[in-house]
């Protein structure tokens, strides 16, 4: 079977969604077409370990390696969304995969006193 050919995209955008339970990282081209995707759950972490910073770092290293090797990506812009624990470590994982981060953007949605928040946790 022939090896799949990938188009060359030197610059891309990494969209990181960090929730309390998981971290999702997708890499797209500048037009917004998704090239590769990985989550902490897809990297082999299950249960509460998906929401850890280590799970986010492993997932972002995997997706960074995919983008670098398959699409010849060198520079990446990062857009972060969500309050999760894996925000910073996901960016660190992209850097350790050999991608140069050209800018960071925080796109966390903040309500202007919209919906009532869920009840406070009692542990």
Curated annotation (Swiss-Prot):
InterPro entries xref list: Ribosomal_uS11, Ribosomal_uS11_bac-type, Ribosomal_uS11_CS, Ribosomal_uS11_sf
Record family assignment: Belongs to the universal ribosomal protein uS11 family.
Signal peptide residue numbers: none
Protein name: Small ribosomal subunit protein uS11
Function: Located on the platform of the 30S subunit, it bridges several disparate RNA helices of the 16S rRNA. Forms part of the Shine-Dalgarno cleft in the 70S ribosome.
HAMAP family found in the cross-reference section: Ribosomal_uS11 (MF_01310)
GO cellular component, one term: ribosome
Pfam families in the cross-refs: Ribosomal_S11
Keyword check for Ribonucleoprotein: yes
Species per Swiss-Prot/TrEMBL record: Coxiella burnetii (strain RSA 331 / Henzerling II)
SUPFAM superfamilies membership: Translational machinery components
Keywords: Ribonucleoprotein, Ribosomal protein, RNA-binding, rRNA-binding
A biological process from GO: translation
Ribonucleoprotein among keywords: yes
Gene Ontology molecular function terms on file: rRNA binding; structural constituent of ribosome
Superkingdom of origin organism: Bacteria
PANTHER family in UniProt: 40S RIBOSOMAL PROTEIN S14/30S RIBOSOMAL PROTEIN S11
Subunit structure: Part of the 30S ribosomal subunit. Interacts with proteins S7 and S18. Binds to IF-3.
């Amino acid at each position: 079977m022939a090896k799949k050919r990938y188009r060359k995209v030197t610059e891309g955008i990494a969209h990181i969604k960090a929730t309390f339970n998981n971290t999702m990282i997708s890499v797209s081209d500048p037009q917004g077409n998704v090239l590769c995707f990985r989550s902490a759950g897809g990297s082999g972490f299950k249960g509460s370990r998906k929401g850890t910073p280590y799970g986010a770092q492993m997932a972002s290293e995997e997706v960074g390696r995919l983008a670098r090797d398959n699409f010849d990506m060198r520079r990446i812009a990062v857009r972060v969304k969500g309050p999760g624990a894996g925000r910073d470590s996901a960016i660190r994982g992209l850097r350790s995969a050999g991608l140069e981060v050209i800018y960071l953007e925080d796109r966390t949605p903040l309500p202007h006193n919209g919906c009532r928040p869920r009840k406070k946790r009692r542990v």
